[in-house]
Amino acid sequence: MSENNNDKITAKKTLTLKRSGSETNTVKQNFNHSRTKAVVVETKRRKIARPDEKTEMPQPITKPHVAPPRSKPRIEKPVLVTPTAQSNLSSTEMDARLRALEEAHIQDEIIRKQAAEKQIAERQAAEKQAKESEEGLHLQKTHKEKIQKSSSNTTKPTPLFSSTVSPIESIEAALTLKNTAASKRKADENDDDEKYNRRANLSKSEIRAPKIIKGTDERRRGKLTLNSALDEEGNSRGRSMAAMRRRQEKFKRAQNQEPREKISREVILPETITIQELAQRMAERSVDVIKFLMKQEQMMKPGDVIDADIAELIAIEFGHTVKRVSESDIEEGIFNVDDDPQKMKTRPPIVTIMGHVDHGKTSLLDAIRKANVVSSEAGGITQHIGAYQVEQNGQKITFIDTPGHAAFTAMRARGAQITDIAVLVVAADDSVMPQTIESINHAKAANVPIIVAINKIDKPTADAQKVRTELLQHEVFVETMGGETLEVEVSAKTGQNLDKLLEAILLQAEILDLKADSERTADGIVIEAKLDQGRGSVATVLVQKGTLHLSDIIVAGNEWGRIRALIDDHGNHIKTASPSTPVEILGMQGTPQAGDRFAVVAHEAKAREIAEYRQRLARDKAAARKTGSRSSLEQMMTKLQTVGVKEFSLIIKGDVQGSIEAITAALEKLGNEEVQTRIVHSGAGGITESDISLAETSNSVVIGFNVRANKQVRDLAETQGIEIRYYNIIYDLVDDIKAAMSGLLSPEKRETFLGNAEILEIFNITKIGKVAGCQVTEGKIERGAGVRLIRDNIVIHEGKLKTLKRFKDEVNEVQIGQECGIAFEKYEDMRAGDTIEIFRVEHVNRTL
């Protein structure tokens, strides 16, 4: 590029004005919505020495003068010091003046360096802008050539501007005018200022964004700025930021319109899922899923819930694979832990003592344990299931004692399911009884070998042979009768042949070859559970596999907990419980149900999750039983028939869960088609204030079985009029509830025939009405009895006698063959020859 004004450059010169020492510039500011504002700025230029200029250094003077530093606000005029005056100065003053001169030179040098650095930076910026302007002009020229080529090949588009002047020509004309004016202004300036100003103005005026004409295939260029989009005067308004953003998004969308490759995913499907959730797991739009369902004639919304089958069809249709899971999967792996065959060791046998009530099961176990359990049971009958462990010849045997009463059927069935050997106790003087037969059936259903113990052999009326013969009728063949079932004649009272019974048990256990892996995680079954005051939930469990340790986390039914204590059958605290060991555990969050299986889990989170799932499942089942929205016709008819059934509401609190279960089963059998029992609430533990409140709202009777209410609860019950009944024998409880329910039965009407009378004549009596003159043909007539009017052997009226007179006197009774006058209540259609039947109705109380 030439520094002469007449030389041509790649772009036309800009219009400039001569810069004076003080000049006024107008800066035009552009705002949104086409608003502008002009600001007048006055600047003063100072002469700055450029690096390429030759600066004449001042001649050194022989006599120094003091120049004040520029940083001081007060500048004094330098005074020329004559040699005479200098000679009058002291050495201190001369040193001060020399230091001031040196500081002034240092300050000037610093200012000169800063100005040089600033000038270099400005020159580099100007060169960069000039380079960018050259590139812009080159792009503009290329753009113009493309437009000319496209116009020659295609039809000419409708011009956006006036037909007389094209945008390119207007730009060139404006540039020509600006360069002409600039050449006149720059003629009076020196060459250095002209070179500097021309570069600065060139970078501002000629760096313009080329206008884009629609329909061209121009590629994207660099990012535009507002300054480069506007000229120096601001005549044209550039694109807004929103417009530029829209343009970029449109370009991106155009690039992304290429078809993407379908990604197949593995979709995990639970039992139920919403359409929105399914679409998110497939990474599809929920609208597309809705459209697919509409094609299948299923009108649904994104929030609708569908089952796993429909969700699987949708996922397969969209090209994904499916993995179905269930909420019950969380329970997998807690019970089906494989045993290591190399670690299997012999375990003690689990023996269940079964039989009829009062046949001596607990007494036999007492004799074996050398303890007195019967005395602790109310009424002398076993009402709890107990587990004990005894030792015979160095080998342990675990005994489970089950109740023999008819109400404890579920307990006997549970005892047979968890046992290895069943000892059937039959009294020699009583032979086979109903619960004996039931125990045999439970043992056979559980495929458990039976050992028959013929008890009470010491009694004079004992007949062991009769017992063996009656057992044959129920397919129990003892060894003495040619069978395979072991039998032992014992006496729990005298202890006769108890050692033979234990040896028979150990022999049967050896035949069964009972083994277990004691090193795996423990699991087993809950034999009994109760809520103990001061200790919380206490569960009696039987470890079947593995070893149960203190602080283990277990899940039992709907409850979970961390074991805080392990107590054996003797009341001793232990740290571990091996297989076939019955123990009491403390630390459960709630009271589990008797018969629930328990297992040890790894951590609390999993135990809590399993328990919550089981509780939710139990609630859903209860709600389904209660609501029953989809009932069959038979269920609807039964419900209509039971609308008028009276209910006897009960709240049952017991010491252990098994007793409550037995009481509930016994009470459910008491109802008939008119009255039924309704168990509002049942649970193990003492009677609380919440039980009284529930009894008040449900109009129930509170029953405590081996539990009591404290003084606060008793006072609350007395205030609210709630009856609390205490029992410790299940016989008495069932009998009292049966008598109370009998009181709810409507009395039975019994009709007694008294006699017949024939109407001879009808009389009309003032203030009384029609009176029939009758003769008693059979039996007698009593005053206030019921009557039926029979005409031609058809009963046309049934009612009561209003009056009974004989010779104008009121009488209470008229015997056969006598005549009397009879009037009916609210009925007068009587004729001669009709027959009157007299009867008496009696109300008799009914019982269940």
UniProtKB/Swiss-Prot annotation:
Region feature G1, mapped onto this chain: 355-362
Binding sites annotated in the UniProt record for GTP: 355-362, 401-405, 455-458
Function (record text): One of the essential components for the initiation of protein synthesis. Protects formylmethionyl-tRNA from spontaneous hydrolysis and promotes its binding to the 30S ribosomal subunits. Also involved in the hydrolysis of GTP during the formation of the 70S ribosomal complex.
Biased amino acid composition, Polar residues: 17-33, 149-163
Family to which this protein belongs: Belongs to the TRAFAC class translation factor GTPase superfamily. Classic translation factor GTPase family. IF-2 subfamily.
Record SUPFAM superfamilies: Initiation factor IF2/eIF5b, domain 3 (SSF52156), P-loop containing nucleoside triphosphate hydrolases (SSF52540), Translation proteins (SSF50447)
Residue segments, region G4: 455-458
Region described as Disordered: 1-79, 121-163
Pfam families, per the entry: EF-G_D2, GTP_EFTU, GTP_EFTU_D2, IF-2, IF2_assoc, IF2_N
MF annotations from Gene Ontology: GTP binding; GTPase activity; guanosine tetraphosphate binding; translation initiation factor activity
Chain residue ranges for the region called G3: 401-404
Region annotation G2: where it falls in the sequence: 380-384
Comp. bias intervals (Basic and acidic residues): 1-10, 121-138
Keywords per UniProt: Cytoplasm, GTP-binding, Initiation factor, Nucleotide-binding, Protein biosynthesis
Region of interest: G5: 491-493
Cross-referenced InterPro entries: EF-G-like_DII, EFTu-like_2, IF2_assoc_dom_bac, IF2_II, IF2_N, P-loop_NTPase, Small_GTP-bd, T_Tr_GTP-bd_dom
GO CC, any one term: cytosol
Localisation: Cytoplasm
Main location group: cytoplasm
This protein's name: Translation initiation factor IF-2
